[in-house]
Amino acid sequence: MRMGGSFVVLSGVIAIVVGSVLGGCARYFISGAVARRLGETFPWGTMTINVTGAFLIGIFGALATHPGSMFASPNPWLFAVTGFLGCYTTVSSFSLQTLTLARNGEPMHALGNVAFSVGLCLAAVSCGFLLADGLGG
């Protein structure tokens, strides 16, 4: 029985590692592409990452409530949410970029970043949850 428990833990760790690698790479490429396209004077790349991540976690969260969904079992959740989205989204970058805006004499941009990021992320997670819940139910 101990061997089976070790396998479950190891498979969960592998799911997290693979998801983390893919999520980190996706964040790097998408955030960079958005920043190059829209400019780097405002953290559009980080906002895009966090809003799309919120949308995706809404989808996965809704799917996890459906007993037949693959996201109702541990490893797909560990891969997609703990691994991929854990490395894809970033509160630390959001926080540093907001502080940098404020310290650079742009307090309105800093407040705008907070308001838009939080508002858009809450809207995105709600939309993702409603979309997936509607399709799955």
Curated annotation (Swiss-Prot):
It is a multi-pass membrane protein. GO terms for cellular component: plasma membrane. It is found in: Cell inner membrane. Keywords: Cell inner membrane, Cell membrane, Ion channel, Ion transport, Membrane, Metal-binding, Sodium, Transmembrane, Transmembrane helix, Transport. GO terms for biological process: cellular detoxification of fluoride; fluoride transmembrane transport. The keyword Ion transport applies. PANTHER family: FLUORIDE EXPORT PROTEIN 1-RELATED. Belongs to the fluoride channel Fluc/FEX (TC 1.A.43) family. Fluoride-specific ion channel. Important for reducing fluoride concentration in the cell, thus reducing its toxicity. This is Fluoride-specific ion channel FluC 2. It comes from Bradyrhizobium diazoefficiens (strain JCM 10833 / BCRC 13528 / IAM 13628 / NBRC 14792 / USDA 110). The gene is fluC2.
